[in-house]
Amino acid sequence: MLWYIVAGAGGLLIGYLIANYQINQKLRKAKEDAQTIIEKAEKEANEIKKKAIIEGREEVHRLREEFEKERSRREEELRALEERLLKREELLTRKEENLEKREQQVEELKANLEEKMREVEEKEKRIDEELKRLAGMTVEEARELILEEARQRYEHDLAKLYKEMKEQVEEEAEKEAKKVIAFAVQRYAPDYVGEITVSTVSLPSDDMKGRIIGREGRNIRTFEKITGVDLIIDDTPEVVVLSCFNPLRREIARITLEKLVADGRIHPARIEEMYEKAKQEVEKAIKEAGQEATFKAGVMGLHPELVKLLGKLKYRTSYGQNVLNHSIEVALLAGYMASELGLNADKARRGGLLHDIGKAVDQELEGSHTTIGAELARRYGEKEDIINMILSHHGEEEPMTPEAVLVAAADALSAARPGARRESLENYIKRLMKLEEIAKSFKYVEKAYAIQAGREIRVIVEPDKVDDALAEKLAYDISKKIEEELEYPGVLKVVVIREKRSVAYAK
């Protein structure tokens, strides 16, 4: 009996040990399988990564080949244009030779006329003697009679010849001018996109709209105050709209908002930080835009400050037309026409590119954009003939050179193209600019921003010099001056903002 008990206990012990061993074997196998799966996943991930890198390199190579093809095509077009220009120059040379031949014919006609006059004088002498013999007239009386008859007869012929030649020359000159202008316009036929007063910023999700607004709207108020741009948030999915008549302020605001959305941290301090970074980016973009404009127009050797001012024109519009694109267009048109007429094309392009340079700062300085532009050009070393082109394209001075006339003509061509400018948008922008100018004319005003499509103006004042009572009076005075000097629909809200900041650092 005892032996059975011992045997049963031994069997149980052996069964336990075997079961424990099997469990340990299964655990070890499970760990090995898990390690194998992990290694396999890592291997597949590396293969996917390598494949993505290879595909990326292939895409870069493809894009590079497309770029080289496009560049080759553009170079071929340029060579074709140069060949056409050479042919036009040859045609112009032949026409000049024909004109010289006609001038020679005129000289020959003039010589023949003088010869006939001498023959008339000889006949007059013979007639004098005959009249004196036959009629008993004095020499003076006979001479006066003959001269009067000859004068009446030949003056009529000479006047008729002069009129015919004048009409012929004027007709040919008009035809040639039309050909020159048509050829210049055909050589430069750019695409044009009208400027608008809004920009859109895409959002990763509609949840971001709440973060942009902030607690009780503090973020959106800070953003609009710092940038001077309306931030419009509506039901449009994953999009917000920035509205401002000033393209420069709108671009800075767009970059600021995109940086905030990408960063994800949106609060007043972060808004100010991103705004400063956006301003630096736009300053860099302005410089690059100016350099690109000089390259497109083929103008070299400009002062760096003039290049920077050209870049600012990228963010200015005139009747809905971008001023920088307009300046490049005027430069190229003037250069083409100068080449056709055998004039200085480099000088014409330089004057055309700089003719509206004053518009880069005319909001900051007193005077017309032509006067301001001439002052800037003189300050940065431009020659008097270029300065004359700037002043004469709107008639403030008489053109000193043929190139100045071409710049004025190119300016008119660019502005008069159908669809190039829009009157209503320009009037709206001028009204908003006038609104800001009125607010800035008051003492202690630092900045002024017209927002809400001109229905509200926010005025930021110096906090150390304006208290609450003076702020209320300033708002009243500004509103009264706006009522006197501007016409506007509905009610216009004037908001005076004074903010005092004290900053200290704990070390």
Curated annotation (Swiss-Prot):
Q: Tell me which EC number(s) this protein carries.
A: 3.1.-.-
Top-level EC class, please? hydrolase
Q: Where in the cell is it found?
A: Cell membrane
Gene of this entry: rny
What is the designated name of this protein?
A: Ribonuclease Y
> What is the species listed in this Swiss-Prot or TrEMBL entry?
Thermotoga sp. (strain RQ2)
Per the database record, which ranges form the KH domain?
A: 197-282
Superkingdom:
Bacteria
Topology relative to the lipid bilayer, per the entry, is:
Single-pass membrane protein
- GO cellular component, as recorded: plasma membrane
**Positions of transmembrane segments:** 1-21
